[in-house]
Amino acid sequence: MAGYLSESDFVMVEEGFSTRDLLEELTLGASQATTGKVAAFFVADAVVRKHFCFLKYLPRVRPFYAVRCNSSLGVLKVLAELGLGFSCASKAEMELVQHIGVPASKIICANPCKQVAQIKYAAKHGVRLLSFDNEVELAKVVKSHPSAKSWGEVLTLDALGLHHTHRRVGCSLMFQASVIASVAQGYLELVCQPFHIGSGCPDPQAYAQSIADARLVFQMGAELGHTMNILDLGGGFPGLEGAKVRFEEVTSVIGKNIPFYTPPPCHVPLRTHATKKMTSSDFCCRVHVTAKEKPLFSPFLTEQTGAAPKSIVYHLDEGVYGVFNSVLFDNTCPTPALQKKPSADQPLYSSSLWGPAVDGCDCVAEGLWLPQLQVGDWLVFDNMGAYTVDTKSLLGGTQACRVTYAMSRLAWEALQGQLLPAEEDQDAEGVCKPLSCGWEITDSLCVGPVFTPASIM
């Protein structure tokens, strides 16, 4: 192993153990004081499988993980052990990944609008890859970090995407030549051409267009004296089952277009941000009912239906200003699982779930049909791994989410066998070696040089 993980960091569980299994087992054996806290549960096996899947479909691509997605230490350590690089948007994120031992060569300062203090921190601690998308940002980098390797960002017009990153990030193709010329004037080295595709984009062909645009930028750079040797494929990969576009569809488009637009001798190393793909579905979160309001009586609905509807309002210890922020930003509708499965003859009531904020926006979900709950009951929400459990609540006095990390013995042994020792894993700048370090990716399993648990896939 590379040395990021300690067995004591994780609860060791049986193979096939789910986050729900972990939650139920730990809750049954916990005291009331412990179970009354907001808690999240993470089983690392799914991340290990997703990493192998990523290498299978994109063997040339080196994944980077955006720390802002989920900066839980257990997650970062597993990803570091798997060999991922880290995309950091702040000084605090760079400090965090360096604290667990990640070398500066595997860190990108990927915020295109950086504070000067952040640039100086990167310079002091050896982080040389910095992104930019305009001349003003470039001037700041030249002044505060003259040895930096610049990372120019080109936008992709993902008109159908859920999050339109081009509103804030990326330089249009029209202005890219002038930005590249500014790099030359600042005596910086331009080494990479990334592009951004918004999360939730339903059209895989957006990646094809982006790769074609990046090829044009490579040509512009060559004409102005820059030999760009890295192509960053951006992010936006689907991370949940049932997404409109499957991960395999996206990788198929990328796989077909990369050889066409980057043929030998332009066989450039590739990087990407596999953020939501890695963690979205690997956490479940437990919250509690803290208050309950009596069924609401609506004269209007009574007149329309002929019967008084029973709508119960439950208040939870977390809301949309904390772990359920996806309700505001991603238009999700969280659906809880109950502590106990209701019997077939148990009546269901129209119910709504609200967070602790005293305002009309902190509605987690409504229109749910649930059995009658009591104060102190807990509800479980799946798919809480991305921009959720690690989000600091905007409400004063709310508690941090306590995370329990688990891993099967099989996944632990797979991690032990799949990487070189840290001192041998010297990652040279500009060189994109396969993260598998000798692992052969096949259709059904990953065959390691010494040990390979076939069932991990």
UniProtKB/Swiss-Prot annotation:
Aminoacyl-tRNA synthetase recorded as keyword: no
Pfam families per the UniProt record, alphabetical: Orn_Arg_deC_N, Orn_DAP_Arg_deC
InterPro entries given in the database record: Ala_racemase/Decarboxylase_C, De-COase2_C, De-COase2_CS, De-COase2_N, Orn/DAP/Arg_de-COase, Orn_de-COase, PLP-binding_barrel
Upregulation: Up-regulated in activated mast cells (MC) (at protein level).
Family the UniProt entry places it in: Belongs to the Orn/Lys/Arg decarboxylase class-II family. ODC antizyme inhibitor subfamily.
Record's miscellaneous remark: Arg-68 is present instead of the conserved Lys which would otherwise be the covalent pyridoxal phosphate binding site.
Function per UniProt: Antizyme inhibitor (AZI) protein that positively regulates ornithine decarboxylase (ODC) activity and polyamine uptake. AZI is an enzymatically inactive ODC homolog that counteracts the negative effect of ODC antizymes (AZs) OAZ1, OAZ2 and OAZ3 on ODC activity by competing with ODC for antizyme-binding. Inhibits antizyme-dependent ODC degradation and releases ODC monomers from their inactive complex with antizymes, leading to formation of the catalytically active ODC homodimer and restoring polyamine production.
Complex and partners: Monomer. Interacts with OAZ1, OAZ2 and OAZ3; this interaction disrupts the interaction between the antizyme and ODC1. Does not form a heterodimer with ODC1.
Annotated protein name in UniProt: Antizyme inhibitor 2
Organism annotation: Rattus norvegicus (Rat)
Phylogenetic lineage: Eukaryota, Metazoa, Chordata, Craniata, Vertebrata
